[in-house]
Amino acid sequence: MPSSVTRRTAFGVFGIAGISLLSACSARSSYKGKINFNSYKGITAALYKPGTEQDPPANIPEPVYYAGLNERTAEGLYKFIGFEVAYYNYLLFRGFTSPWIERGFTDSSSCPCYTTYRDISDRWLISDTYAPLTVSIMDDMPFEGPKDNTYVWTMKFEADSAARLYDKTSRRSVNLNSLNGTDTEDKGYFEYANGKWKLLSSSSLPSSWSPGKTASF
C-alpha cells in the first residue's frame, strides 16, 4: 500500500474485481460529465446517516456489481467506472488506509493493503453524502489504447469540499479534498479480458501515447 494517495493510486484502487470494441450499439454519443452510480444493496442508501464529531456514520451503502458492468461497450465501461468509484467511497468509510496514512493518522508500516485504519470509535469520515469522491468523464468516448483490447478515457477525480477525515482522540480534522490527486485529470487505462473490464496502472501507459482513434462500437 503506498503511503500517499496520488493520481495513480486514486484511480488505481478502482481495480478490484481487439483493436476496437466488439460491434454493439452505444447507448449515447457522449459520456462527458459526472458519473452517477445508483446500484446499492437494499435500502441503505436511503437510510445513510452522516457522521459527526460525536458519532461515526451509519448505514453506509454497499455498491452492487451487476451484469451490465461486463458489457464490452462504452456503456459497459462507463458503468464499470461508476461501480469502482462507488466502491472506493465505500472503502473510505469502511477502512481504506491510504488517506489516513498520508495525513499522519496511521503508521504505513503496519497497514497492509485494505486493512482497516482504525477502530470505528476512534476515526471516521464525516460527509453529508455517502459518495464524497466523484469522477467525471472528460471525453465524449474512450480512445483505443496502445495494445489490443485496451482503451483510454480521461477522467477528473474530485472530492466534496465539506468531507473530512476526523480523529476523535486528537480532535484533528483534515479535508478530504486536500489529498493529492483530487481536482485533477488523469488518463484511465482499461483492458477488457476474460469477459470483464479491469483498470490497468496508468504507469504502464506509454509516455509517448496520445489520443488518436476513438474506440468504435
Predicted segments, located by residue:
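Actinobacteria-biased recognition of intrinsically disordered, low-complexity terminal regions
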Residues: 1-2
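N-terminal export leaders
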Residues: 6-11
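Bacterial N-terminal signal peptides
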Residues: 15-20
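C-terminal motif of bacterial Sec signal peptides marking the signal peptidase cleavage site
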Residues: 23-24
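Exposed beta-sheet edge and beta->alpha loop/turn motif
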Residues: 29-41, 144-217
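Acidic, low-complexity proline/glycine-rich segments
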Residues: 37-60
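Core segments of small alpha/beta cavity-forming domains
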Residues: 52-131
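Long amphipathic alpha-helical coiled-coil segments
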Residues: 131-138, 167-172
